[in-house]
Structure formats: structure tokens, C-alpha cells
Design a protein with these regions (language model features):
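Alpha-helical metal-binding/catalytic segments enriched in His/Glu/Asp
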Residues: 1-17, 113
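An extended, acidic, His-containing surface patch that forms the Zn2+-binding/catalytic region
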Residues: 19-108, 116-129, 137, 141-198
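Generic solvent-exposed, charged/amphipathic alpha-helical segments
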Residues: 7, 11, 131-135, 169
Length: 198
């Protein structure tokens, strides 16, 4: 089936048991300053890093069960937000609506993929690598096509200057009674790169 072929092709990209993207070129080393900031923020926020999200839940025999995050380690949760690549399927074609589905083979399966990359990974190069990974040597000589549809490299803030870090900490201490914490946000905002270039 075309869906099984799609699963096999996506298995080249992602470990479905862990969600880890397999191409090493889609990963990068976390800069030392960002790692230190994440460690400090994880110590401040603890479990609130992931508990504050409205996790999906269902009622099972009177006891409410909640979906769990992929990690309950506060530091890892912060790093996964920005410094680990992530695959999401954001759309699908070739599937009838449930009420119209029958016991037939469908002629094709199409997915729209969203790939979030760490800010130090070149997006244009990653798109080309992804195209090769998905299209080459398709199972059963099936025709697999990938249209990159664009992409932009993320942004990593320049190193924090001592005077700015001191000003942030003083303001945070005055208002919150604690040192400043830093949280990176995954997702590309191309404007940030343009602004940083002047």
C-alpha cells in the first residue's frame, strides 16, 4: 500500500519510537552559552517547563489520564524546544473522510511535512538532503516525490555582553526576586536574521 511505502520512507528520516531525526546533519552542538542558560532556567522552572502546557486528556473510568511529554527532565525539555530537530506531519492527501472510506487500496498517499531545525543548521542544505533521503531508492520502485516548498535557517542570538546580562539580572532581581532565565523558542522567524544583519 502507498501508506506502508510512506511509513518506510519516513523511517529513513525519523526513529518513530523516540522521535529523533536520524540524519546527523540535521543536528548541531548546543553552544556552551545556550547550554549554561538552559541549565540555569531549568533549575529555576523545574517541572513547570512542561507542566504548564494544556496536555490532552481523557476520562478513563473516573480517573483523568493526561498525555505525557517526551521528557520530564526540565533541561532536556528546554533543549528539545530549540536545539533538537523535529518532524511534524501537518497535512495529508489521498485519504477519504472516515464516513466515505471503504475496503479499497488508495492510489497515493501525500503528506505535508514540517521540519524544525536547530538555528545553526543550514535550512537550504537540509532541504536538499531531505529530498535525496526521501526520493532515492524508494521501496518497490514506487515513485516518491518531494517538493521542498521553502525553508529558512533559524536565528541564534549573538553572545550576551556582560553589561546587558548584568542589566537583565538586576531588573529580574528587582521585579521577580530571582536571576534572569533564558528560554529559546523553536520555529523560524526569518525577520530575526534580517534584523541581526543590519
Amino acid at each position: 500500500s502507498s501508506f506502508r511505502i510512506m511509513r518506510q520512507v519516513l523511517d529513513r528520516l525519523e526513529d518513530s519510537a523516540t522521535g529523533r531525526l536520524l540524519p546527523q546533519s540535521f543536528h548541531c552542538e548546543v553552544p556552551a552559552e545556550r547550554l549554561a542558560q538552559a541549565q540555569a532556567t531549568a533549575a529555576i522552572l523545574g517541572e513547570e517547563v512542561y507542566r504548564r502546557f494544556p496536555w490532552a486528556h481523557y476520562d478513563c473510568g473516573g480517573s483523568t489520564q493526561f498525555a505525557l511529554p517526551t521528557t520530564t527532565d526540565p533541561l532536556q525539555a528546554l533543549l528539545k524546544r530549540t536545539w533538537e530537530p523535529t518532524l511534524s506531519v501537518t497535512g495529508a492527501e489521498g485519504f477519504p473522510a472516515l464516513q466515505d472510506a471503504g475496503n479499497v487500496l488508495r492510489p497515493y498517499t501525500a503528506f505535508k511535512l514540517s521540519l524544525r531545525l536547530p538555528p545553526l543548521v543550514d535550512a537550504a542544505q537540509a532541504v536538499q538532503e531531505l529530498k535525496t533521503l526521501l526520493e532515492d531508492n524508494a521501496p518497490y520502485q514506487a515513485r516518491v516525490t518531494f517538493d521542498g516548498g521553502g525553508g529558512a535557517t533559524g536565528w541564534n542570538a549573538p553572545a550576551t555582553t556582560p553589561w546587558f546580562e548584568q542589566a537583565l539580572n538586576e531588573a529580574s532581581q528587582a521585579h521577580f526576586g530571582a536571576s534572569c532565565g533564558y528560554i529559546g523558542q523553536g520555529g523560524t522567524i526569518p525577520l530575526m536574521n534580517m534584523l541581526s544583519e543590519g
